[in-house]
Design a protein with these regions (language model features):
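Membrane-interface junctions at transmembrane-helix termini in multi-pass inner-membrane proteins
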Residues: 135-158, 350-380, 391, 395
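Interfacial segments at transmembrane-helix termini and the short loops linking adjacent helices
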Residues: 106-129, 319-351
Length: 503
């Protein structure tokens, strides 16, 4: 039963991500990378970013506390606590609302210091509309958490699908009639999100209460528990803010170009790399819980080996076909900045491997109940990213921001591995470096073959890229087989034995 639920939610999430990608395609098709898209992206990010600095830590602590309260005191107590939290967050939202509404220009300069003239005027108008989102997004976050406690996963997972369809329609209406409909659509989507969740909330018999107690012990406890999440979330938002404000100074449409390139990058990470980590992580957590250090050491090395095997060939193929990928995905309608987006994508793809490794190692630290080390590592990464952003954007423009992000991820991933090795002496990553060399050689051979064959193809269509990729992956797999990687050989041997056993 649980496997069916997980599979169903996985399918819904995949469809949601695909419709989200279509939403980005619609925006690029109708408005390209322009002052309008820059203004829209900044205006809609301001409410979320400011709230994330304050409220996301509270929301992350909500589910365990509310779940515990429901088990101990029943549904009414959990509903009442949810209402008190909502009322508390509404107060925070109202303060944020008035600050943004009356100091719009000053706040925009924090988010996009390079905005001037028409783009600034447009962003001010958009922001005054988009700020209303904050109230509805709070409700969506809390209600989604409450429904998850009551095992109502499907509608929460499916919310993104109709929301993205509304965004696509909104982009068309804004293009056809007036671009002010872009931020208006964002507000409509947030209102729709709340309405969408009302039906499952009725099924669990949730009733909203206006009562609020600032001295509530559980609220105070939740605030205390939310501090690590708040710090981590704040660091992430600062990193995001720095990238965008520097991009706003480099070129008109720069924020949009980086947004489109990073969306492509995140799509690959989400569809191909994150599932690998999701599959590997439960076994890691089990080894840590049972204190099987030798088994854990071996499994971490194996997990990183699998990540290397998946990430490196994807990285090199994305580098080879970056321009073709951008052309196929975005190269239509009003979108003209193919070269700039392709260069940004090339630099972002360098981070495929460090993103995956870092995500895995962070989860290892969390399993050891160590939340401090990843937060310190994130803080260090932000400092590195800011320094590299300022330096590289001067010399290579917009691409420098993408490169700075990737380099900071490489550095933080490497330092996190070293920290893990020092903290837990039984760990050694010498085996991983040997695997890396073998996978890198296999990937290099694959790359040479693809580049050689690419010379003989005049126009690269989707079909020709697919064929070259398949040929490249076959070469890569054969080469990798002859590299004699222990865990891979063991895996193949076990599969052969199990196949013989079923006959």
């Amino acid at each position: 039963m649980m496997k069916k639920i997980i599979f169903s939610i996985g399918i819904i999430t995949l469809i949601s991500k695909l419709t989200g990608f279509l939403r980005d395609l619609a925006l690029s098709y109708y408005f390209g990378a322009s002052e309008i898209t820059d203004a829209y992206l900044i205006a809609t990010s301001i409410p979320g970013t400011i709230f994330n600095l304050v409220g996301m830590g509270l929301i992350s602590a909500y589910i365990p506390i509310c779940s515990h309260l429901r088990e101990k005191k029943g549904d009414k107590a959990s509903f009442f606590f949810t209402s008190k939290l909502l009322n508390f967050l509404f107060i925070i939202c109202t303060v944020i609302f008035f600050l943004v509404f009356f100091f719009t220009e000053q706040i925009i300069h924090i988010f996009a210091s390079g905005f001037q003239g028409e783009v600034l005027k447009l962003t001010i108008i958009y922001t005054k509309v988009a700020i209303f989102i904050i109230y509805f997004n709070i409700m969506i976050s809390i209600f989604s958490g409450l429904l998850q406690i009551y095992n109502k996963f499907f509608l929460v997972a499916a919310l993104g699908i109709p929301s993205n369809i509304i965004y696509i329609l909104g982009s068309y209406i804004a293009y056809k009639y007036n671009n002010i409909y872009l931020p208006i659509t964002a507000v409509i989507v947030s209102i729709f999100g709340v309405i969408f969740l009302l039906q499952p909330l009725k099924k669990i018999k949730y009733k909203y209460s206006l009562k609020f107690d600032s001295k509530d012990k559980l609220l105070k406890r939740m605030m205390y528990l939310s501090i690590p999440g708040m710090i981590g979330g704040s660091l992430e938002q600062i990193n995001y803010l720095v990238d965008r404000t520097i991009a706003s100074r480099v070129v008109i449409g720069g924020i949009s170009i980086l947004n489109y390139a990073s969306r492509l990058n995140l799509a690959v990470v989400g569809l191909l790399i994150s599932p690998v980590i999701t599959v590997l992580f439960p076994k890691l957590a089990s080894c840590i819980a049972l204190k099987k250090n030798n088994e854990l050491k071996e499994y971490i090395e194996t997990s990183i080996g699998y990540i290397l095997m998946v990430s490196l060939p994807i990285t090199f193929m994305a580098l080879i076909f970056s321009k073709e990928i951008v052309t196929i995905v975005f190269g239509r309608g009003e979108f003209k900045d193919i070269d700039l987006t392709a260069r940004a994508l090339s630099f972002y793809t360098i981070a495929f491997l460090p993103i995956a490794v870092r995500e895995l190692i962070v989860r290892v630290f969390y399993s050891f109940k160590d939340t401090v080390t990843p937060v310190i590592n994130s803080g260090f990464g932000i400092i590195v990213n800011i320094i590299l952003n300022l330096l590289l954007s001067k010399y290579i423009g917009l691409s420098g921001i993408a490169l700075a992000t990737s380099l900071s991820l490489i550095i933080t991933s490497f330092t996190l591995i070293i920290t893990l090795e020092k903290k837990y002496k039984s760990f050694s990553f010498k085996e991983v470096s040997i695997i890396f060399i073998k996978v890198f050689i296999s990937t290099l051979i694959m790359t040479i073959v693809i580049l050689y064959l690419k010379k003989y193809i005049r126009t690269l269509s989707f079909l020709s890229i697919l064929m070259l990729s398949i040929i490249g992956l076959i070469i890569y797999s054969i080469t990798l087989f002859f590299m004699k990687i222990k865990f891979l050989d063991d895996f193949i041997l076990n599969k052969i034995k199990s196949m013989k056993g079923t006959k």
